[in-house]
Every structure is written in C-alpha cells, then in structure tokens.
Amino acid sequence: MASLRSATALSRLRSRAGQQSNLSNSVRWLQMQSSADLDLHSQLKEMIPEQQERLKKVKSDLGKAQLGNITIDVVIGGMRGMTGLLWETSLLDPDEGIRFRGLSIPECQKLLPAAKPDGEPLPEGLLWLLLTGKVPSKEQVDGLSKELRDRATVPDYVYKAIDALPVSAHPMTQFASGVMALQVQSEFQEAYEKGIHKSKSWEPTSEDSLNLIARVPVVAAYVYQRIYKDGKIIPKDDSLDYGGNFSHMLGFDDPKMLELMRLYVTIHSDHEGGNVSAHTGHLVASALSDPYLSFLAALNGLAGPLHGLANQEVLLWIKSVVDECGENVTTEQLKDYVWKTLNSGKVVPGFGHGVLRKTDPRYTCQREFALKHLPDDPLFQLVSKLYEVVPPILTKLGKVKNPWPNVDAHSGVLLNHFGLAEARYYTVLFGVSRSLGICSQLIWDRALGLPLERPKSVTLDWIEKNCKKAA
C-alpha cells in the first residue's frame, strides 16, 4: 500500500512538474520520501547525526564565505534584509513567497495529506514536513494526530492562572499567561538541571515542543470561551485532527470552518526566521531557555501592532469602510476612502510586506478558498475590490516597494464569515499556528548545537567617529 500511495502521489507531482517545466520538484520529492516507514522520533534520531556532520562540513568549507556588506542604513533600519540567521524549516523568496522545506504553498496543498479528498492540508502533515523535510504518508499523519491529541491535557492550574486575570484583559495577555503556566511541566528544564549532555538536549526539547504544540489550542480555546462565550471548556473530539479540533473547541463545527482552520494553521505556521516572533523565539532559546519560555517570548513579540495585530486591524478597517460607505461600495467610493486613510497619515492594513515583492501566496490560497466556499460574502467581495483598487494607489505614491496584499488582508474576512467575528482574538489564532514553526526550529537549534546569539551593537558616537560619509 505504501508503494502504491507513493506511486500515485509521484504521478500527480510529475504531471504538475511537467506543466511547470520543473523537474527539480519531483527529484526533491523523491529525496524526501526516504525512511517513510519510520515514526517521527525515529526519523529525527536517524537524521540528526547526518545533519550535524553536514553543519560541521559547511563550517569547515564555507565558514569564511561572505554573505554581503552591512551598511549603516541596515544597522539603524532594524537589520531589514540582513542575512544573519540559520533557519531550517522555511525560506522566504521575495517573488515566490514562503517555501516550507522547499515546498511552496500550492505544492503543500497538493502533496500533504488532507482530511478529505481535495481538502486543505492537515497541519500535522506540515509539522512533519517542517521537522523532517519529508512528505508524510496519511498513516504517519494520523499517528501524529493521535499523539498530539494524547498530549493535549492541560492542568487545572493553567486555567486558574488565566482566571486570575480580568476577563477584559487582551486575549493575547490571557493566552500568554496560560502558556507561562504550562512551563511548570518543562521536561527540558528538568533534564538540564540533572546535567543532560548537550548532544541529547534535543530529546527533551522535542518532548516540550510537541506537548506545547498539542496544548496551546486547548488554552487558546478556553481564552475565547472565557472572554466571548459562557466560559465552559469544550472537550476535544478524538475523531478530529489538530485544526478540526481547534475549531471544535472554539465552538465552530461547520465542516467548512474546520477546513478553514486547517488551512489557516498551515499557512500561518512559519515564515522563515527573521520576523519578530520567530527571531525572538530563536534568540531566547539560544540562552537554553526551554521551549515554553522561548515560545512565550515569541508570543509577546507577536502581540505587537507591527506584527501579529495586523490581521485584527484589517478586519476593523474593512468594517469601517462598510460603516461609512455601505456594503455595496462603488469603486470610486473605495478609492476615496483609501486616499482618506492615506492622507490622514495611516496605512491601508493588509497591503505590503517587509520581504515580499509580489502578492503573498498565503493571500492567494485564502482567496481561492473564498471563491470555492463563500463567493457571495459581501466582505469577501469588498476584499476583492480592494485587490483591484489599493495596489495602483500605493504604486502612484511611489514610496511602497510592495503594494500587493499580504496574508492579513484576507484571513479576518474568512473567519468573520463563519462566525468568528471577534477581531481582537485573531492574534491568538496566529500564535497557535506559529507554534508549529517556532517549536520545529527550536528542536533543530538544540539538535545542531547552535550557539548563544550575541550580535555586536554600536552607538551613534561610534558611527560618527568611525564611518566615513558615503561618496
């Protein structure tokens, strides 16, 4: 059966690769299929020595190779675009968008197992891909699904820690407090205190990471129920997968909403290592802080208005358009409202990206989902109009490198359609999703023995004294 599944999937990929004249995709996929009979832990245990040797060889052969010049503009500009991190799980291309272990979002949708035929990829499949670089079988994904369900037990003191906060506290504050309380059970901290050898530290890191990934949807769902509903805990459904169960525990059982949550978690899981949340998690973990502490720090970065709060602000802005112009807003009215926003010194939320220079493929796959499941939704139709109206206006301004929509331009409208309309909560959904990418990389940080992060800083005085003016 395994060989039949592989042959069928390979046939699909060869057809797709032929259409795109890209044979490398099928070659890469063949490489990724080795050791398909092993469970997740066994695969990691087999891979890690090979990757450790690979890293040693890279350091030996290429350690002195230069990656580029750093200018003062880069130093005072947030290190934007500076290559300075090793991040194995994903890579962001300015034109193609994110690739998870070399696979684009459309390729992941094609190759990763789904809950139903032609459905969205299961987040467990992406987690397997991020950790191993291999496309899992449906049986492997089902096994990982069960493992995560078995790990998804949250102690009572976690709920009590959240309950100690006012209900009015921001959802991210309550979510972060719950994650902090989970840290009490850290296996990495216990192993470190007992003197675990550095070469084995990836194993308790893996245990913590899988426990954390399994439990954060439970904590997040409780935060939602506490703030917006009756405060009751909806138990997990052992027949459902990770994304489906998250939707269920939030109180949404529409099959289309379950599919949306699978897609949402998958595409929000990772976006290489330089964004605030990913970099923060990596930085804190480099001090040998356990995965709970590291992910908590990442969440606090994600809560910032310039990072994870953007998806919240998009829906609020779109609703403000409807409030002022009505649902049947004309193109001219929409142009006027966009200019009004820009002339007031604000940005149009959901457009532009620090790295991407084309439409975010995460936006595109959400648009395809909407066209399939909710083509007549008024807010979706408004988002479609914005796609036509906003980029030309931003291009005309001449100050924007990327006028195209990003992932945040669409997600709120989809969630709102199925009843999850509380925009203030959206960053929590983002946080749950990002646990997959951050924790996967933390395991590899420990497996590869990556060092403490310690860049050099300078003062304005130092710059003025030591740097000559550019010619």
UniProtKB/Swiss-Prot annotation:
NCBIfam families recorded: cit_synth_euk, PRK09569.1
EC numbers, comma separated: 2.3.3.16
UniProt xrefs under Pfam families: Citrate_synt
Species of the source: Citrus maxima
GO CC terms of this entry: mitochondrial matrix
Annotated TM spans: none
UniProt keywords, alphabetically: Mitochondrion, Transferase, Transit peptide, Tricarboxylic acid cycle
Classification via Gene3D superfamilies: Citrate Synthase, domain 1 (1.10.580.10), Cytochrome P450-Terp, domain 2 (1.10.230.10)
UniProt family annotation: Belongs to the citrate synthase family.
GO biological process terms held by the UniProt record: carbohydrate metabolic process; citrate metabolic process; tricarboxylic acid cycle
Enzyme class name: transferase
Catalytic activity: oxaloacetate + acetyl-CoA + H2O = citrate + CoA + H(+)
Transit peptide range per the UniProt entry: 1-18
Note: Citrate synthase is found in nearly all cells capable of oxidative metabolism.
GO terms assigned for molecular function: citrate (Si)-synthase activity
Catalytic site positions: H307, H353, D408
Annotated compartments: Mitochondrion matrix
Assembly and binders: Homodimer.
Pathways per UniProt: Carbohydrate metabolism; tricarboxylic acid cycle; isocitrate from oxaloacetate: step 1/2
Protein name stated in the entry: Citrate synthase, mitochondrial
